[in-house]
Amino acid sequence: MFVLLFRFVFGGSISTGQPGGYVQLLMPGIVVQTVAFTLAGTASGLAEDLKKGLIDRFRSLPISQSALVVGRTLGDSMLNIVVLVVMALAGLAVGWRPSSGIVKVLIGFVFLFMFGYALSWVGIFVGLSVADARVVQNVGFIVTFPLTFLSNAFAPTTGMPRVLQYFAEWNPVSTMVAGCRELFGLKNIFGATAGSFPSENPLLMSAIYMGVIMLIFIPLSIRKYKNSSN
């Protein structure tokens, strides 16, 4: 729905000055947004499993205490592969044509996969921290919506108020979108202020963000799960 909405409703009013028009810049933003929603999906799914008692059944089995949460993140990440394929096909259907070659496109999708995997660990922590599945889903969307819409995913950040522009420049969604645009063969005209570190090094910043997220939330989530099982 977002692909069709932005492509055919809003796309005609946004000039990019690049071959292929708005859809070429739109698709990386839409795909990153979709992957970012992994956080909410993982959190609400885990909370629902806790509510139904499925987690208690797994705890009674002779398996590692961390196996459940690791399996949950890997399972949701595998689902992301299907989502990425569907999004790519939808993009191709509405005119998206990456021009960088198959190798760079595949690297871009690997980055997207890893971004979703990192965010799924945030979702695990949120799902274990909030008991109510409905509240968990709301918390997940409260986190992901500002990150996706206060970014360069759909429009230039240069027109934002300076405070919001600064946030958007360092937003991990913005760096992921900018990095994917580069890997897909596009100049990121919706990027941050020229010369800023995120705009000059979006792929490096994305890798740093993913590493920091996993470094923080993998041990936190496993510890949270072990404490809750006690």
Predicted segments — roles?
Residues 3-8, 181-230:
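Alpha-helical transmembrane segments of multi-pass membrane transporters/translocases
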Residues 8-10, 127-174:
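Transmembrane helix segments
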Residues 155-200:
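Terminal transmembrane helical anchor/hairpin motif
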